[in-house]
């Protein structure tokens, strides 16, 4: 019986360390061939933001960056996801990455 309980508890303890299926996703980093598994942020508060560099709300990059800088040490992360759905984003990822870092100093993860 003791052996059975040890095996069962080991089974459940391994599952406790598994990443949530929702986060267990590889995302390609903007303007890079590198990928990042979102399980890295499993214990973080995550804000996913759909962004566009030529949108009327582009100025919000500055506020997002300030928010990220203020709370990132407290397990908070912003994940930026550029969208070309409304033709308000640069056509190349290189241009998007350069714009975000040059104009707004964005250093939160972008995919």
Give the residues covered by each predicted segment.
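Conserved hydrophobic packing residues within short motifs/helices of P-loop NTPase cores
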Residues: 46-49, 79
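Sec-dependent N-terminal signal peptides
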Residues: 4-14
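N-terminal "domain-start" segment that seeds a small globular fold
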Residues: 18-39
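Structural microenvironment flanking redox-active thiols in thiol-disulfide oxidoreductases
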Residues: 57-111
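Amphipathic alpha-helical repeat scaffolds
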Residues: 50-54
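Proline/glycine-enriched tight loop/beta-turn segments at coil->beta junctions
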Residues: 40-46
